[in-house]
Amino acid sequence: MTEYLLLLVSTVLINNFVLVKFLGLCPFMGVSGKLETAVGMGLATTFVMTLASASSYLMEHYILIPLNIAYLRTLAFILVIAVVVQFTEMVIRKSSPTLYRLLGIFLPLITTNCAVLGVALLSINERHNFIQSIIYGFGAAAGFSLVLILFAAMRERLVAADVPTPFRGVSIAMVTAGLMSLAFMGFTGLIKI
C-alpha cells in the first residue's frame, strides 16, 4: 500500500509531467486563460489519462506481446487514446454542453496531447503492473490538472495586475510557469527512493 501511495505522490508532485517532464505544454499554455476552462480540461484529461494508461497496459500485455508485434506499440497506443478521447467527448457533450463549448478544439486535441501518450509509454517502460499503471496514469493526470488549475488561477490574477507592457501576455505566462516549476522543485527531497 505504501508503494502505491509513494508512486502517486511522486507522480503528482515530484515528477510532474508538465513541470519536470515538459509533457502537455500545449494545453497547459492554451487552456489556462480561464479557471473554469482549466478545471474542465483537467477533469477530462484526468479521465482520459487514467483510462488510457489502463487500456495501454492491457493492449501491451494481452495483444502486442502475445502476437509479437510490440514494435507497433506507439501506433496502437495512439489508437487506444483516440477511442478513449472520443468516448470522453461524447460523455462531456451529453452531460455538460457548456463545458463542451468552452473546451472547443482542445477536447479533440487531447488525442495528440503528448502527456497522454507519454503516460502510456512511460508506464510500460517503467514495467508497472496493472494497478501501478492505473495509479501512475491517475497521478500524472492529477499532477497535470493541479498545475493547470494553479496556473489558470495565477493567469486570471495577472490580467488584473499592473504588469509592465513588455511582459504582458505570453511573456509573463512563461515567467510564471518558470516560477511554478521552481516551487515544485521544493518537493524533490520529499521522497527518498
Curated annotation (Swiss-Prot):
Keyword Ligase: no
Membrane topology recorded in Swiss-Prot or TrEMBL: Multi-pass membrane protein
Family named by the database record: Belongs to the NqrDE/RnfAE family.
Task performed by this protein: Part of a membrane-bound complex that couples electron transfer with translocation of ions across the membrane.
NCBIfam families: PRK05151.1, rnfA
Name the UniProt record assigns to this protein: Ion-translocating oxidoreductase complex subunit A
GO terms under cellular component: plasma membrane
Transmembrane segments annotated in the record for this chain: 5-25, 39-59, 63-83, 102-122, 134-154, 171-191
Coiled coil: none
EC number: 7.-.-.-
Species this chain originates from: Aeromonas salmonicida (strain A449)
Oligomer status and interactors: The complex is composed of six subunits: RnfA, RnfB, RnfC, RnfD, RnfE and RnfG.
HAMAP family: RsxA_RnfA
Keywords, in A-Z order: Cell inner membrane, Cell membrane, Electron transport, Membrane, Translocase, Transmembrane, Transmembrane helix, Transport
Gene Ontology biological process terms from the UniProt entry: electron transport chain
Catalytic class of the enzyme: translocase
Gene designation: rnfA
